[in-house]
Amino acid sequence: MSFDINWSTLESDNRLNDLIRKHLNSYLQNTQLPSYVSNLRVLDFDLGKVGPAITLKEITDPLDEFYDSIREEADQETEENNDNKEDSEHICPDRTIANHEGPKDDFEAPVVMPSPNDIQFLLEVEYKGDLLVTIGADLVLNYPVEKFMTLPVKLSISDIGLHSLCIVACLSKQLFLSFLCDVSDPALDDNQTVLDPKGPILAATKPLERISIVRSMKIETEIGEQYQGQGSVLRSVGELEQFLFTIFKDFLRKELAWPSWINLDFNDGDE
């Protein structure tokens, strides 16, 4: 069973686009960069106007791992609250006698039990939309000496294609999303990932891995005209594009591919 989503609501949400951009930048800050690139950052993120095609395959109870995650988070919050409580007692010794009456004043972790309203969807997601990621970087030329020249470049990632199975679990006011595996798709399997229309071409991964999430994409690079004919610059640009393609795929697999997931917690809205 297929259904439509109101993609325009997400696409027009600047806060969501900015949140994703910040999350990507946080990941890049913890990524070891090669010697030929520095100051790698996401300048802009746009979900685009074309949403994914989604087909509902199955409805089940949520996986136990999601409940375990909520319990672990609740236990951690309880432990932190009790630690803060102990710190405040040390600061205010006049309250020590009252607080020694018993453990009744300690914070207790809430009991997490499955609810009849909890539900999980197995979805087939196909995306060939107009999402656009704009990235800035400094290309470092280390010849004839180290850091001989630094060249600012701007790269655009577009034409992203994916076709995967994923699970979406709704537990109380929390939503979990995780990708399970890729779906065979001739349009993507036979496609090529273009790193630069005038540069090298990297063929899409074959044979099909269990999960790549991103199966095709295009990266275009803008550099100053005075550098476009220099072989060393073009080689470095090609290496940078391949590096971006790799870390972009790795980011999605580490963050979204099972046994990893993203968790959207809407409980804070009650405060």
Curated annotation (Swiss-Prot):
The effect annotated for L16D is: Does not affect function
Q: Which UniProt keywords apply?
A: Endoplasmic reticulum, Isopeptide bond, Lipid transport, Lipid-binding, Membrane, Mitochondrion, Mitochondrion outer membrane, Transport, Ubl conjugation
Q: Name one GO cellular component term.
A: mitochondria-associated endoplasmic reticulum membrane contact site
Q: How does this protein lie in the membrane? A: Peripheral membrane protein
Occurrences of domain SMP-LTD (ranges): 1-267
Q: Name one GO molecular function term.
A: lipid transfer activity
Major subcellular site: mitochondrion
GO biological process terms on file: aminophospholipid transport; mitochondrial genome maintenance; mitochondrial outer membrane translocase complex assembly; mitochondrion inheritance; mitochondrion organization; mitochondrion-endoplasmic reticulum membrane tethering; peroxisome organization; phospholipid homeostasis
Glycyl lysine isopeptide (Lys-Gly) (interchain with G-Cter in ubiquitin) crosslink location in chain: K49
Q: What is the effect of changing N17E?
A: Does not affect function
Where is this gene product found? Mitochondrion outer membrane; Endoplasmic reticulum membrane
InterPro entries from the xrefs?
Answer: Mdm12 (IPR027532), SMP_LBD (IPR031468)
Q: What does this protein do?
A: Component of the ERMES/MDM complex, which serves as a molecular tether to connect the endoplasmic reticulum and mitochondria. Components of this complex are involved in the control of mitochondrial shape and protein biogenesis, and function in nonvesicular lipid trafficking between the ER and mitochondria. MDM12 is required for the interaction of the ER-resident membrane protein MMM1 and the outer mitochondrial membrane-resident beta-barrel protein MDM10.
Entry's family note: Belongs to the MDM12 family.
Q: What is known of its domains?
A: The SMP-LTD domain is a barrel-like domain that can bind various types of glycerophospholipids in its interior and mediate their transfer between two adjacent bilayers.
Q: How does it assemble?
A: Component of the ER-mitochondria encounter structure (ERMES) or MDM complex, composed of MMM1, MDM10, MDM12 and MDM34. A MMM1 homodimer associates with one molecule of MDM12 on each side in a pairwise head-to-tail manner, and the SMP-LTD domains of MMM1 and MDM12 generate a continuous hydrophobic tunnel for phospholipid trafficking. Interacts with PUF3.
* Other known facts: Present with 1070 molecules/cell in log phase SD medium.
Q: Which HAMAP family match?
A: Mdm12 (MF_03104)
Q: What is this protein called?
A: Mitochondrial distribution and morphology protein 12
- Organism whose genome encodes this protein: Saccharomyces cerevisiae (strain ATCC 204508 / S288c) (Baker's yeast)
